[in-house]
UniProtKB/Swiss-Prot annotation:
It catalyses: cytidine(2498) in 23S rRNA + S-adenosyl-L-methionine = 2'-O-methylcytidine(2498) in 23S rRNA + S-adenosyl-L-homocysteine + H(+). It is found in: Cytoplasm. GO terms for cellular component: cytoplasm. One of its GO terms (biological process) is rRNA processing. Pfam families: FtsJ, RlmM_FDX, RLMM_N. Catalyzes the 2'-O-methylation at nucleotide C2498 in 23S rRNA. Monomer. This is Ribosomal RNA large subunit methyltransferase M. InterPro entries: RlmM_FDX (IPR040739), RlmM_THUMP-like (IPR048646), RNA_MeTrfase_FtsJ_dom (IPR002877), rRNA_MeTrfase_M (IPR011224), SAM-dependent_MTases_sf (IPR029063). Its EC number is 2.1.1.186. It comes from Photorhabdus laumondii subsp. laumondii (strain DSM 15139 / CIP 105565 / TT01). The gene is rlmM. S-adenosyl-L-methionine binds at residues 188, 221-224, 240, 260, 277. The active site is at 306 (proton acceptor).
């Protein structure tokens, strides 16, 4: 197996391909990307057989922006016989992997592939049983073992491969399943909720998304992102010249500042979270976030960068590198992650966590 399959949002295959080619080159691993527009996935074929496995071990999945999932696959299995689709799939995995912890039978995130989902769900049970009999799959699911992926791109045609559970997306098809809350003021609320799931480990939610924390939402109206903060019992400064949702204002947890988000400055040093979803040039938003972090006005930030029509990966990489250098020059040690989330469209979501000095600070310092 010398190929890597990367799932992505349809229409962003070129960005996904540019990114994996760049990351592989940094590891001195070379190959070429196969791209089909609006397919929802990219294949990167390595020149050296063993390099595919090395790539999915050594490239941190959390550092990939446009990939929803990353796995090693073999050659495309075509025209699987309807009377026995299982044997060719199991045969692909003999000698490649054993005692895997989970099986996922998946499809690309396209309208055409959605018709295959019903088949995938039915097919998973007999395929799982066959893999367990062959000792390719453990009897019980184990989150610490590799994941087997069977990726159907058309009826009777699939890629078979695996990912490592410590360096992949834990979500089926790489997509968190979130339900839109009926009382939220806009669907944009799902972007921030997904960002929390993707960027913050669940065992740290009680500390980093705790009730009583103070937050600022720049470009808040009507309150989709503020809703997520209020739901977690935070106190929120909502900054926008527009109108906020009455139900959010009625909670008593929101203070509305009718000010331009680029001009607002907090009056106190107790802000933990800064969130921002404003329609503005990426460079301008990036600079605003740098200013907040260097000034010590927040501890963590989640914000969106709107994407240009062309050279989207290059523009994103440039802005993130610029942010990294400016924070470093400002004496700030920070963790930066970016992802093209499922609920993002022509934008990416960035998370920055400022790392404070080595001594333990009290909660009141935030």
């Amino acid at each position: 197996m010398n190929k890597i399959a990367l799932y992505c949002r349809p229409g962003f295959e070129k960005e996904c391909a540019a990114e994996i080619t760049d990351k592989a080159g940094q590891k001195e691993i070379y190959g070429f990307a196969r791209v089909k527009d609006n397919s929802g996935y990219v294949l990167f074929e390595c020149y050296q057989y063993e390099d595919a496995d090395r790539l999915i071990r050594e490239i941190p999945f959390r550092e990939l922006i446009f990939a929803r999932q990353m796995l090693v696959v073999g050659e495309l299995l075509r025209d699987l016989p309807p009377e026995d689709r299982i044997s060719p799939i199991v045969g692909m995995l003999h000698g490649v992997i054993e005692r895997a912890g989970e099986l996922r039978v998946e499809v690309p995130d396209t309208n055409e592939s959605k018709e295959l989902l019903k088949f995938c769900r039915k097919f998973t049970v007999p395929l799982r049983n066959a893999m367990r009999q062959e000792k390719i799959l453990l009897i019980r699911e184990n989150v610490n073992r590799p994941v087997i992926h069977v990726f159907f791109i058309a009826p009777g045609c699939c890629y078979v491969g695996y990912s490592y559970s410590n360096n992949n997306s834990p979500f089926y098809m790489g997509i968190p399943r979130l339900k839109f809350p009926s009382d939220a003021p806009s669907r944009s609320t799902l972007k921030l909720e997904e960002a929390f799931h993707v960027f913050i480990p669940h065992d740290e939610w009680e500390e980093r998304l705790a009730s009583g924390l103070y937050a600022v939402d720049l470009g808040a109206c009507p309150g989709g992102w503020t809703y997520q903060l209020v739901k977690r019992s935070m106190m929120v400064h909502a900054v926008d010249n527009g109108t906020m949702s009455k139900s959010l204002m009625d909670t008593g947890q929101v203070k509305h500042h009718k000010v331009d988000g680029f001009k607002f400055e907090p009056s106190a040093k107790n802000i933990y979270w800064l969130v921002c979803d404003m329609v503005e040039k990426p460079a301008k938003v990036t600079q605003l976030m740098v200013d907040w972090l260097v000034n010590g006005w927040c501890r963590e930030a989640i914000f969106n960068l709107k994407l240009p029509m062309k050279k989207r990966y290059e523009e994103v990489a440039h802005n993130l590198q610029k942010m990294h250098l400016q924070l470093k020059e400002g004496g700030i040690n920070a963790q930066i992650q970016a992802k093209h989330l499922y609920h993002d469209r022509e934008e990416i979501t960035v998370h920055v966590r400022r790392i404070w000095s080595a001594y333990a600070a009290s909660r009141n310092d935030y």
